Amino acid sequence: MAPSTRSPVMHETDEEDWFAEDDAAAPAAAPPTEFDHIARLLRPLTRGDPVALDLLDDAAVLPSRPGYDLVITKDAMVAGVHFLAEEALDVVARKLLRTNLSDLAAKAAEPYGYFLAVGWPSGSDVASRETFARGLAEDGALFDISLLGGDTVTTSGPLVVSATFLGWAPQGETILRRGAKPGDRLMVSGTIGDGWLGLLAQWGEVMDADGAMLRRYRQPEPRVTLRDAMRVHAKAAADVSDGLLADSSHIAKASGCRVRVDLERLPLSPGAQAWLDQQPEQVEGRISLASGGDDYEIVCAVDPNEAWAFRVAAAAAGVKVSEIGEFVEGEGVSAYYKGRDVTPSRLGWLHG
């Protein structure tokens, strides 16, 4: 990240504020003061957390927590790249929070709070900022997380939003990508392929009569309730953002082994199964579902002797998990279907 001379938290002396606009685009009427919009839009997002210092200072002060590790993750999204430019901004806000929460879930970390950065396109109106803040507030209450600070700027480019999330994990118990061993089972939460199909539905390329797949794409469900079961049973994990095949391969690479994915055992929703039933080639259809991404499920390595106990613990947390493959000697990722080896035509999304 490039160095910045700007303050790391939103506060009353920032030059660029939540409602900042170019002078040429400013309305004739005087805009609200910085105190007004910080108090009205941003301060409520702190939910009274003393760490945020009411957004009156240049930094947040985070107390240490003996016996715990601080887990930090960051995601950024750009209009026209990660979401449609015309997407409702409360939806954008909620997806930003949920993708970060999914990263913490993969580490079995308890979410604590977040720092926010927004690059508003020049000329953005007050209503846009209000809608964005509403989405943050809704999910802040839903997931019990608070805004701790951040920054806003005005840009000549598209809307850019970024969040840095903090979470706690008992010392030494953070689940990493490395840790899988040959013989471990590959297991995944929820269902696979709905996020990708939801994106296609948003483009009008697939039918989504009840809107279930579109909801999965726009508002993923981070598996934050799975952390206790993971701490006991998971040896390595990742969240499924780039695609099940790609993210499984990340675990294998970090762990120094190979992962084999059984395409026949992919857990599918009724909508995904209906789509698959219409495909002329089952294997290619399953590869598409396993490489599409945006599922935000948890894929993990579990000792074979722990697999059943993990299922039970996950079910108690309200999450279904399925066994979909195994780790073996070697490197990389491979797939098979009905006992026959398959070479995937793609694994998932690549980051530039």
Swiss-Prot record:
Record's miscellaneous remark: Reaction mechanism of ThiL seems to utilize a direct, inline transfer of the gamma-phosphate of ATP to TMP rather than a phosphorylated enzyme intermediate.
Residues that coordinate or bind Mg(2+) 4: 58, 73, 103
Enzyme class: transferase
Gene field: thiL
Alphabetic keyword roster: ATP-binding, Kinase, Magnesium, Metal-binding, Nucleotide-binding, Thiamine biosynthesis, Transferase
Provenance organism: Caulobacter vibrioides (strain ATCC 19089 / CIP 103742 / CB 15)
Function description: Catalyzes the ATP-dependent phosphorylation of thiamine-monophosphate (TMP) to form thiamine-pyrophosphate (TPP), the active form of vitamin B1.
Positions with a binding annotation for substrate: 82, 294, 349
Name of the protein: Thiamine-monophosphate kinase
Pathway membership, UniProt: Cofactor biosynthesis; thiamine diphosphate biosynthesis; thiamine diphosphate from thiamine phosphate: step 1/1
Residues noted as binding Mg(2+) 5 in the record, renumbered to the chain: 242
Gene Ontology terms: biological process: thiamine biosynthetic process; thiamine diphosphate biosynthetic process
